[in-house]
């Protein structure tokens, strides 16, 4: 397993000793935000077609819950950590839950990793998610205010949408 800053990951400034198939994204408080897998290349899972973050000429757009969280917290999130795990790393970490004679794939191990590490943004397999204590960014505050306003307009008593 290697742990690098998100900037190092984005700029592809790291050396991979093996084929990494699972990633763990942490916030600036060292809390685990998200766990995901890739059958090809983790960098492409983040920044390629249908990735977590869309990369433009002079902008980044979050396309998933974890991508939005990272982009909303730039520039601070450049220093957040991402861990890259190999299949063997995951098997060692989950050894207590596995049959030592079993044959495992990363798709089979991902639920165990999510259940053990309890990331705050994963929904599937996450029966007891952790808490994200990252302070709200200005972008998040503006988005929440706009959503609250839309909710009030639609559902409150004097809404133009009610008959």
Residue map of PLM features:
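Boundary/linker segments flanking structured domains
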Residues: 1-21, 26-33, 38-163
């Amino acid at each position: 397993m290697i742990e690098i800053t998100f900037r190092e990951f984005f700029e592809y400034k790291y050396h991979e000793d093996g084929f990494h198939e699972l990633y763990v994204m942490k916030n600036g408080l060292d809390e685990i935000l998200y766990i995901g897998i890739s059958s090809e290349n983790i960098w492409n899972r983040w920044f390629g077609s249908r990735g977590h973050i869309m990369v433009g000429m002079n902008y980044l757009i979050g396309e998933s819950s974890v991508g939005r969280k990272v982009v909303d917290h730039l520039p601070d999130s450049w220093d957040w950590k991402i861990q890259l795990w190999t299949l063997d790393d995951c098997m060692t970490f989950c050894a207590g839950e596995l049959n030592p004679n079993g044959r495992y794939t990363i798709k089979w191990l991902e639920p165990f990793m999510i259940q053990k590490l309890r990331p705050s943004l994963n929904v599937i397999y996450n029966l007891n998610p952790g808490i994200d204590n990252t302070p709200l960014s200005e972008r998040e505050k503006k988005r929440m205010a706009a959503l609250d306003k839309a909710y009030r307009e639609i559902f409150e008593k004097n809404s133009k949408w009610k008959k």
